């Protein structure tokens, strides 16, 4: 396993067909072929089995572990409430690509779940935000003070509901905004080295140009190659030959056989930054061919 670092190259070619990855560590009994656009990478039966054992399925009411309720901010107008196991720390927030967040409370699973439901209904926040919406705003994020202020405002609204449907067994935690822009590399210019900081006085908008295209799906023989400049949730932001940034949702990779690509100069060979798979415009519905 190779560790990816910002500024390093990444390249691979998809081979053959995409097969179901199975469920809960078990191989798919059907060896099913799954669609290239599926972010789950599972056939219907394996997806059902995987979902049945998740916290979201509410089949683990006697779970003895402690859970935390979080308030997450993904961009202007995009907030959500969720829960995660306390032992996981902030891993769930990184997996979702939360730009900033704060813990709200901690307690037993069902108390955390009940609080989550109360807050969603009272505050009018969704239970999930599509990744397409998250991608569309990553290059246009406001500054750190505005991000922190948005989380603090949501926290104040949520805390005001304590005692109004909020289970007594859920302990409220103090506001502590965690900003993950730096962790995700969204404050870096695409030509910066791995240790560079944005220039003094430059905003995130100026330091991290917005990606305008995303990989729609992998195909047999399709190539993705570029330089890693940011990573948020499952998304890798890759700088490519035309100076733009293409997003690769790594969930689209599961189930494929991949081979490494090497740099070459031939007309049909792969260069250091090629994308030869279908792309889709971020924030729109237009589909493009690969970049050459």
Predicted feature locations:
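Non-catalytic accessory segments flanking enzymatic or RNA/DNA-binding domains
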Residues: 1-292
